[in-house]
Swiss-Prot record:
Ranges per topology, Lumenal: 39-313
Entry's localization field: Endoplasmic reticulum membrane; Golgi apparatus membrane
One GO-annotated biological process of the protein: endoplasmic reticulum to Golgi vesicle-mediated transport
Listed transmembrane segments: 314-334
Primary site of residence: endoplasmic reticulum
Function in brief: May be involved in the regulation of export from the endoplasmic reticulum of a subset of glycoproteins. May function as a regulator of ERGIC-53.
Cytoplasmic compartment segments: 335-348
Cited SUPFAM superfamilies: Concanavalin A-like lectins/glucanases
Disulfide bridges in this chain: 200-237
Descriptive protein name: VIP36-like protein
Chain ranges of the L-type lectin-like domain: 49-274
């Protein structure tokens, strides 16, 4: 038998429900803030960042390298450990890479990289370093820190070994950046100097505290900063305006060793979407591009390779070449006979 509740009974029940609802909302808010999914204001002005989990990687690295559903792929000698992902061990002639499977279509973003480089080698007897990529192609092994040469996109290099002889202008390890449209080669013998956008010294080997690198791309402005002093403070390294990067490229990181070696470890990669205000003029200027470039920096234009000839086209070329050759021979014989006839008439 149902018991009727008076006005005071309904009020008490409604108040209890309201309290439970409010508690649930507060718990949900705390969970979101604790997981990093909520927006966070960064810098001056109306700029907020949102963690994008589909482009981020952190411990415990579940499924990386083993599951087909993982958002990240391993390549080469890269291996998953409990506390980090090792791109290359401290052994000669190794290379490895870690690539995101999801293309990034964000307009403005910030990538925070937590890494560690360490090994047994003494001064200038270690190498070669690691690279962070935002490129059109992924999973393409090659000579540029374990990735393909003539890449299309952005490469940021943490170079630990000076290849150029009599190098006195810069101290290694050295961070540099390069934008490529697929037409440029990375010059190992000169440590990439002919094509670099800028760089700075970064003493990152065999440190006993965490080392971080951040790559920020906002309003076609590329900024690279580092936190390598154990002070939890970002220090400027590279700042380049007018950098045009297409959307839909892939994030990755790679490393390579040669005669010299090091352990190259990645602890985490965290990508944040940055929301920034744009004026109508900026909206017009910041339209999507289809090929990487840098304002006021001339990159060689890509020349499309000629398409291969079809079988019919090749047959026609050979056929008409033979016809032309036969025609030329016949004309030559006729002219020669006429010349001989004229020569006989002169003597008789």
């Amino acid at each position: 038998m149902a018991v009727a509740l008076g006005p005071s009974g309904w009020w008490q029940r409604w108040r209890r429900r309201l309290s439970a609802r409010e508690v649930s909302r507060m718990l949900l808010l705390l969970l979101l803030l604790g997981s990093g999914q909520g927006p966070r204001q960064v810098g001056a002005g109306q700029t907020f960042e949102y963690l994008k989990r589909e482009h981020s990687l952190s411990k415990p690295y579940q499924g990386v390298g083993t599951s087909s559903s993982s958002l990240w792929n391993l390549m080469g000698n890269a291996m998953v450990m409990t506390q980090y992902i090792r791109l290359t061990p401290d052994m000669q002639s190794k290379q490895g890479a870690l690539w995101n499977r999801v293309p990034c279509f964000l307009r403005d973003w910030e990538l925070q990289v937590h890494f560690r480089i360490h090994g047994q080698g003494k001064k200038n007897l270690h190498g070669d370093g690691l690279a962070i990529w935002y490129t059109k192609d992924r999973m393409q092994p090659g000579p540029v820190f374990g990735n393909m040469d003539k890449f299309v996109g952005l490469g940021v290099f943490v170079d630990t070994y000076p290849n150029e002889e009599k190098q006195q202008e810069r101290v290694f390890p050295y961070i540099s950046a390069m934008v490529n449209n697929g037409s440029l080669s990375y010059d190992h013998e000169r440590d990439g100097r002919p094509t670099e956008l800028g760089g700075c010294t970064a003493i990152v080997r065999n440190l006993h505290y965490d080392t971080f690198l951040v790559i920020r791309y906002v309003k076609r402005h590329l900024t690279i900063m580092m936190d390598i002093d154990g002070k939890h403070e970002w220090r400027d390294c590279i700042e380049v305006p007018g950098v045009r990067l297409p959307r839909g490229y892939y994030f990755g990181t790679s490393s390579i060793t040669g005669d010299l070696s090091d352990n190259h470890d990645v602890i985490s990669l965290k990508l944040f979407e940055l929301t920034v205000e744009r004026t109508p003029e900026e909206e017009k200027l910041h339209r999507d591009v289809f090929l990487p470039s840098v304002d006021n920096m001339k990159l060689p234009e890509m020349t499309a390779p000629l398409p291969p000839l079809s079988g019919l086209a090749l047959f026609l070329i050979v056929f008409f070449s033979l016809v032309f050759s036969v025609f030329a021979i016949v004309i030559g014989i006729i002219l020669y006979n006429k010349w001989q006839d004229q020569s006989r008439k002169r003597f008789y």
